[in-house]
From Swiss-Prot:
This is Small ribosomal subunit protein uS4. GO terms for cellular component: small ribosomal subunit. PANTHER family: 30S 40S RIBOSOMAL PROTEIN, SMALL RIBOSOMAL SUBUNIT PROTEIN US4M. Belongs to the universal ribosomal protein uS4 family. Residues 92-155 form the S4 RNA-binding domain. GO terms for molecular function: rRNA binding; structural constituent of ribosome. Keywords: Ribonucleoprotein, Ribosomal protein, RNA-binding, rRNA-binding. One of its GO terms (biological process) is ribosomal small subunit biogenesis. Part of the 30S ribosomal subunit. Contacts protein S5. The interaction surface between S4 and S5 is involved in control of translational fidelity. One of the primary rRNA binding proteins, it binds directly to 16S rRNA where it nucleates assembly of the body of the 30S subunit. NCBIfam families: PRK05327.1 (NF003717), rpsD_bact (TIGR01017). It comes from Staphylococcus aureus (strain NCTC 8325 / PS 47). The keyword Protein biosynthesis does not apply.
Length: 200
């Protein structure tokens, strides 16, 4: 299944979550798109709830179904709670870390920065968004890329960096200090529904 490339605004409203991370999609119209959006009261089945939760998280991270399922399966082989391990693995992706450091305003921008070779991990260029960052590794911006408007503007307006990360705005360098705790990750996601979806 290909990565979704349609309107993130419509998809955000349908799923009830900001896929861009800015929240603008839901400010004026916090309901599903379409003629009957504000009045839709259709009750989802158990399967429908599980599917919607899976889609919310998959679209949030901009992943294909295969990438998403593979990450889910890897999480299941780790010690601990499957759903929490899954959320932690997603938050450890390089594009997710770049976004959380404030180097990009949206996850899509963060993915593009990685794809285009603007990001370094421990001083070496890594252009794979799904690269799993390990505790202690440093994430920085290539010297030639440090004046890109997308990066400069993102850093200027960002006023929050999660506690599992350290970030120096002057050098545009961050450190993945430790694995995040579940409480530090998206609260609007019920990962147990996703576990149930894939356990059918």
């Amino acid at each position: 299944m290909a990565r979704f490339r349609g309107s993130n605004w419509k998809k955000s409203r349908r799923l009830g979550i900001s896929l861009s991370g800015t929240g603008k999609e839901l400010e004026k119209r916090p309901y599903a798109p379409g003629q009957h959006g504000p009045n839709q009261r259709k009750k989802l089945s158990e399967y429908g709830l599980q599917l919607r939760e899976k889609q919310k998280l998959r679209y949030l991270y901009g992943m294909t179904e295969r990438q998403f399922r593979n990450t889910f399966d890897i999480a299941g082989k780790k010690f601990g709670v499957h759903g929490e391990n899954f959320m932690i693995l997603l938050a450890s992706r390089l594009d997710a870390v770049v976004y959380s450091l404030g180097l990009a305003r949206t996850r899509r921008q963060a993915r593009q920065l990685v794809n285009h070779g603007h990001i370094l991990v421990d001083g070496k260029r890594v252009d794979i968004p799904s690269y799993s960052v390990k505790p202690g590794q440093t994430i920085s911006v290539r010297e030639k890329s440090q004046k890109l408007n997308i990066i400069v503007e993102s850093v200027e307006i960002n006023n929050f960096v999660p506690e599992y990360l350290n970030f120096d705005a002057d050098s545009l360098t961050g450190t993945f200090v430790r694995l995040p705790e579940r409480s530090e990750l998206p609260a609007e996601i019920n990962e147990q529904l996703i576990v149930e979806y894939y356990s059918r």
